[in-house]
Regions:
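Rossmann-fold scaffold of SDR-type NAD(P)-dependent oxidoreductases
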Residues: 6, 54-63, 107, 148
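Rossmann-fold cofactor-recognition segment
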Residues: 28-43
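Conserved mid-core segment of classical short-chain dehydrogenase/reductases
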Residues: 63-78
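Catalytic loop of short-chain dehydrogenase/reductase
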Residues: 68, 80-81, 87-90, 102-130, ...
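Active-site-adjacent segment of SDR/Rossmann-fold oxidoreductases
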Residues: 98, 115, 136-145, 187
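C-terminal helical subdomain
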Residues: 142-145, 149-196
């Protein structure tokens, strides 16, 4: 199976790449052999032109601002939406014709869609929007193409985030990687695979 992983250089994308490495994995990120800027639709188009038809696409990108609710302005919410939501939606929108019949997309959300933390309102907004999109898009994608999301908690190998997630039990990259395996190799669509 030929699998494109966008964001393979990060903790979460790296977990997906490691778990799927028995397949032909094409790693894309801001730098490297397959460079892509997911905030630029033309860059996404170039990536798909370069790699050709794929069987599955995993997207693990998106940064969001963390700040107290009173300090978040419209620009912060727009930034979160552009970086986390629109970037992943553009990959689906521009890549749907480059995914084989009965292929799949797997997007990445996060625990803040369902479990709030202080300073996390923009992240909660973006993650919730992506999860709703996955549910809706699953009913309309052509040619039997599936779409799911993986929604992990804070990762064990990202201790710099632990203080922002008090009481949250960190999850292993192995478990996160297996959620991507389930999405890519399974049969479900319109699902959010929670890892917490």
């Amino acid at each position: 199976m030929k699998i494109l992983i966008i964001g393979a250089g990060g903790h979460v994308g790296g977990a997906a790449a490691s778990a799927l490495d028995a397949h032909e994995v094409i790693r894309a990120s801001r730098s490297g052999d397959h460079a892509v800027d997911v905030s630029d639709p033309e860059s996404i188009e170039r990536l798909f032109t370069d790699v050709g038809t794929v069987d599955a696409v995993v997207v693990a990108v998106g940064s969001v601002p963390f700040a107290p609710l009173a300090d978040l302005g419209r620009d912060d919410y727009e930034s979160a939406f552009r970086s986390k939501v629109l970037a992943q939606l553009d990959v689906v929108r521009l890549g749907v014709d480059r995914v084989s019949d009965r292929g799949s997309f797997t997007l990445t959300t996060g625990i803040l869609a369902r479990e709030p933390i202080a300073t996390g309102a923009a992240a909660s907004l973006a993650n919730g929007a992506l999860e709703s999109y996955v549910m809706a898009a699953a009913t309309e994608l052509p040619r039997g193409i599936r779409i799911n999301a993986v929604s992990p908690s804070v990762l064990e190998d990202a201790p710099s985030y632990f203080s922002a997630f008090p009481g949250f039990v960190p999850v292993s990259t192995h478990r996160v990687g297996q959620a991507y395996v389930k999405s890519v190799l399974g049969v479900q669509t319109g699902q959010v695979f929670r890892v917490d």
